[in-house]
Amino acid sequence: TAAVFVKFRKKPTKEQLIEKLESYRGVPQELDLPSAPKQFIRYMQEDDRPQVQLDVDYENGMGISIGRIREDSIYDFKFVGLSHNTVRGAAGGAILCAETLKAKGYIQAK
């Protein structure tokens, strides 16, 4: 779980920020890799989400859950982000890296 504070050169509206987060597609999504989450980032509208027990396994642990987006007096926005440290950060991240390397031709079968 992370408390995130962001500031932009040109401040978007909250709705624009949510739309950009939800529509984000990275290289793993563009390549349609087997372990890549279909929707990498999801925004949760509930005031008490994301929560570890309820949301850590989103997209089999490979997705990111974001919620509680609020305007901030120092930064533009603040929000809570949640990802699975072992699945997304270590084991699953390593698998995703290997899949990316193979898809881009850096790893080839003998």
Model-based region annotation:
Residues 1-78:
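C-terminal substrate-binding/catalytic lobe of Rossmann-fold NAD(P)-dependent oxidoreductases
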